Each structure stands twice: as C-alpha cells, then as structure tokens.
C-alpha cells in the first residue's frame, strides 16, 4: 500500500498533474492545425509527465546538497518547470513559432516562443505546491 506522505506519493501526484496538463494541452492543438496524436502532441504529454516526476523527486532536497541553502517548494518547482519548458522550446522552436503566430496568441502581443517558459514556471510551481501540501518534503520522507 502506498502512503500519500512519501516520495512515491509525491511522484504519483506530480505525474497525475503532468498528465492532466498534458492532455489539456493536447486538446488545444487542433486549434492550431496540429494533429493531436502527432510527435508534437505526444511529446508535449510526455514532457509534462516527466516534469511532474522530476518535481516529485526534487521534493527530497529541502536543502541544496553542496551549497547548503534552503530550497522551498516555490523555488524547486518553478526552477524545474522553467528548465523543462526551455528545453521544450529549444527542441520544438519551429512548431512553437507557428503557435505563437496564430490569432489565438498574437492579440496578446507575444511573438517569441520563449514566453512559454513563464507557463513552465507557473506549472512547475503548481506541481511543487500540490506535491508538498499533500505528500510533504525533505530527506526524511519514506520511500513508499
């Protein structure tokens, strides 16, 4: 039996949030004439699930192991989210450029795909917050 207050609980919560956000992102792809089940759609889903997994694992580190400074959830989650979305934008720049040029996005005045990193910061922060509130944090968390 898996206890929710554990490392495994954090990972399950992160994967669930990542899966939900990935599915929602995939459902918006037809608005930009991008197939849902294409490489971009499935890569988007996989990226958010892996982001949830890593934010779950990062909950073990409430202090940096080498520099010894405090790393609360509001630092860890957005850092992981920004890193994942930066990698995502760098790998899918052309497709993200098409999305940013659509009429659904241009009215906001955002032209660069790198604005998506702000989404990663918000999503990573949400993942870190929910995982910490429901499953705890720190090196004393049980494995399962």
Residue ranges and their predicted role:
Residues 1-144:
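Juxtamembrane/disordered regions of integral membrane proteins
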């Amino acid at each position: 039996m898996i206890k929710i207050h554990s490392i495994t609980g954090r990972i399950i919560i992160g994967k669930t949030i990542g899966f939900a956000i990935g599915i929602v992102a995939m459902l918006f792809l037809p608005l930009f004439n991008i197939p849902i089940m294409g490489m971009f759609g499935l890569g988007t889903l996989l990226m958010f699930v892996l982001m949830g997994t890593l934010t779950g694992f990062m909950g073990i580190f409430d202090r940096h192991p080498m520099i010894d400074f405090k790393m609360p959830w509001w630092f860890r989650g957005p850092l992981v989210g920004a890193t994942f979305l930066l990698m995502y934008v760098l790998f899918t720049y052309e497709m993200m450029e098409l999305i940013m040029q659509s009429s659904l996005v241009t009215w906001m005045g955002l032209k660069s795909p790198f604005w998506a990193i702000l989404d990663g910061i918000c999503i990573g922060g949400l993942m870190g917050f929910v995982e910490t509130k429901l499953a705890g944090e720190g090196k004393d968390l049980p494995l399962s």
